[in-house]
Amino acid sequence: MLLEKNIEKRKSLLYYLMFVGIMFLLPEHVEANEFIVKDGKAGAEIIIAENPTRMQKLAAEELQFFIHKISGANLMISTSVTDENLVKIYVGKSSYTDALKHSTEGLKYDAYHMISGNDYLVLLGNDEDASMKGPGDNIYKRDSKSSEEATEKWDKLVGHSRWVLPGRSRYQSYSRELGVRYNDQRGSLMAVYDLLRSLGARWYFPGEFGEVLPQTKTIALPKVKKTIHPDFPMRQITGSAYKFGKSNKRQALWMMRLGLGGLPVSGVHGINNIIHRDETRNDHPERFLLTRGKRAFAGHGKPCLSSKGLLEDNIKYVRTLFDVYGKESASVMPTDGFVTCACDLCKGEFTPELGARGVQSNHVWTYVNNVAKEVYQTHPNHKIVCLAYGSYVVSPSNIDRMSPNVYVMLNNGRGGFVDPELRDLSISRRNEWLKKLTSKQPFTTHGNYTWLGNSPVPWYIPHTIAEDIRSLKGICIGEYIEENCLRPGELRDDQPAPVKLAINHLNIYVTARLWWDADQDIDVLLNDYYKKFYGPAEKEMKAFFEYCEANVRTMARSKEQIQKALDLFGLAEEKVDKSSIYGQRVGLISKSLDSSRNLLRQLSVDRSNVSRFKPFRFDNDKEIVIDGDLEDPYWKRTRFGQLKSTNVENHKPKIKTLLKKGMSTSSLYLALICETEEGKQTEKLNKKKDDPSIWEGEYVDILIETDTHAYYQISISPNGELVDLKVNGEKQDFRWDSLAEYAIKKSENQWVLEIKIPFLTNNGDPNHKLDGRYPKGDKAPWYINVGRKRTKEGKPLLCSVAHTGVDSFHVIEKFARCFMGKSSAERAAKATAKPIPE
C-alpha cells in the first residue's frame, strides 16, 4: 500500500514537472483573463480561421506586431484556442465567431464589428480575397507572357481585336512583399487599427518616421460593442506611389493604416478601351475626332462621339465587362485632352452659351446617357460613370433627368476652396447636377492634391477639407483623389522620409480620417496631431500651421507673410533636439520650406519691369530628339527670337544669336543658332566637363532661377565643353550635375546648340537636375536669362534675353520671368469678359 502511494506521488510530480516544462515553452502569459497584456506578459492569443484569407492573415500579424512594439509581449497566432485562461482575440471570421453568432452580413466597404465578452474580443469584418474573373487573372505576376496569353483569350472571347484587355493593369494592385491585393476586402484589418488607435497608436507618415506608439506594460480587455461603417464607401487616393504593385511595403501599409480602400474606382477615360488598339485605327478612322483637317490619332487617339458605330461598340463593351469580369461599374468618359470635333456629324453639337466649362456638356453627356439607357435594360444594377471634366463640367441643358444608372464623378478642386467664390461656384454646379441625377448617392468626386504638395508656400488646408467633406456626406458615394508629388522610387527602404510628403501628409491624413467620420471635431484631430507628432514643439508647430492656413490664399504674393511663417517655424526649431524623432520631423518640414525661402528672396527683388520668357508647350517628351536638327516639327511650330546686347538697350548685334524655347512638365528645351563671322571656323568638338577656362572664350550661358533655388548656371562652348553649377549669392557649387542632354551641329558661319534640361519637383537629390515646380501660371514663376559671349579683337561681346545694363549675364533682378499659360491678370480679364453661367 505504501509502495502504491509512493508511485502515485512520483507520477503526480512527473506530471507537474511536464506541465511546468510545457508552460516554459509557451509565451509568457498572465493567469487572469481581463487583460490582453499584464506587466509585459501575454494575457491573450489571436485566433484566425483554419484557412485565413490574405487580409485576415495580415490583420492578425499587424495586431501581433504592434502589441509587441507597444508592450513587449508576444501574442500567439493560432487557428484554435490553446488556453482557456487566455483572452481570445478573434480576428476575422472563423468557426468561433460563427459559434458566437457574429456575422459579416451587411459589413460592406471595410465596415466592421468590435465586440467584447467576458474573456474575448471580436474584431470582425469582410476579409474576402479579391476575385479575379475573366482573362488576365494571373497578370498580377507581372509576367509579359501571361499578358499576351490573356489578350489572346480576350480577343477570342469577344471575336475581334478592337478592345483593350480590361485586366491589363492588375499587377499594379498586388503587393509582393505583403502578399495582398489592393482590392482585397479588409474589414477585420480596419477593426485591428481601430483597436490600436484606441490605445494611442497613430500613423501620420509612411514607415517608423510617421509612427506614434504608446509604451505600456499593461493593456486591459476593453468593454466594447460597436459596428463602424465608413461615411464614404469609396476612399481612394491614387498616383504611381499609391499602387501596391509599384510601391513598397511601408507605403502600402500606411495606406491601409489610414483607412483607404472600400469601393473600387471604375477608372477614368474609359472610352480608351474601345479605340486604343490598332484595329480600330486601321478599320475605323472615322471614329477619331477631326481637328485641323486630320483625324486625331496621336497619343492613341481621341474619339468622335458622333461617329457611326462608336456608341454601339461602347454598349457592347460595357455589357461584356459586366458579364465576364463581374464589374459593378464602367467608365465611358472621353480621353484626356478631349477637344471639339470639326467633322460634319458634330456640327451644332456644341454649347458655347454654357461657357468654357460647358461647351461640350450636351455633346458628351448625351453620349454617356445613351450608353446608360441601353445598358440599363440588361444591367439595371450596374453603374455607368463619367467625370465632369474640362469642357463638360457644367450639367447639360438638353437633359432633364439622367438615366438612373448614371453616376457622375464631379471634378472637385478642393484646394481652391480657400477662395469662397470658387467654393460657391462648385456647390452651385453640384446642386445643378443633383437635380438631374436619381440615385441616393449619385456621384463621386475627383480631386487632385498634387498641386497642394507642389505649392511654393505651405498649402495646409485641414479646415477647408473638413468643411467640404462634411458637405458631401450622404449625397456622395466617395472620393478619388490624385496625388502625384510622390514617386515610387522615393519610398525605397534606403531612402529618407520624402520631402514631397512634408505638406501633403497632413492633408492626406485629415482626408482619410474624415472619410470614416465626417462629423468629428477637426480641431481635436489636429491638436492630437500637433502633440503626438511634434512633442516639445507642439505649441509652436500649431501656431505655424494655423498661420499658414489662415493666410494660404495670399502668402505666395506677400513677403511679409512668408517671413512671418518662417519666423514662427524658427521658434519650433528651437524647441527640438535635431537628432530626436521630433527634430527629424521638424527638419523635414524645414527642407520643404526651401521653396518659401527662395520665393521670399524673389519677392524681395524688384522685378516689376522684366521681360517675359515664354516657352512653347511640348506635350510629348518622347517625340523630341536632341540631335542639333531644328527642322523637326516641334521646333517648326515655334518662332525664333534674337538675343540683344546686354548693355545697349534694344540693340541687336549684326552677328545674330537666335533662340527657340520649349517646355514640358519635366524638361526645358532650348535651341540656339549662333552665327559666326564669315570664314571663321570653330574648333573640333570636345565635350569636356567643368573646366572654368570655358569662360575665357566663346560660350552660351543658361541661367535658371527656379521657384526653389537661387539659380543654376549651364555654360556650353561651341567645342562642346560644358560647365554646370549652382549659384547662391557668392557661393558656387560645382558638385551639381544638370544631366543636360545636348548636341552641337556646325556648319559654315554658324553653330547650332540644342539642349534638354530636366527638372524635378521637390527634387530630393541636391546634386542632380534642376529642382523646381513646373511654372504653370505666374504665381510661382521661374526667372531665366540665356546669353552668348563671343570675342572680337580681344573685346568681349555679350548678348542675352535680359537687358542687364552691364557686361554680365548675372544680374538676377533683370532675369526674364518664365511661366506657362496666361497670367493671373489675363485670366481675370477673360473671366470678366466671358462669365461662366451658373
Residue spans for each PLM region:
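Extracellular/periplasmic catalytic domains that process cell-envelope and extracellular macromolecules
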Residues: K38-K41, T82-D83, M114-G117, V324-Y325, ...
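Substrate-binding groove of N-acetylhexosamine-processing glycoside hydrolases
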Residues: A201, Q215, V224-I228, D323, ...
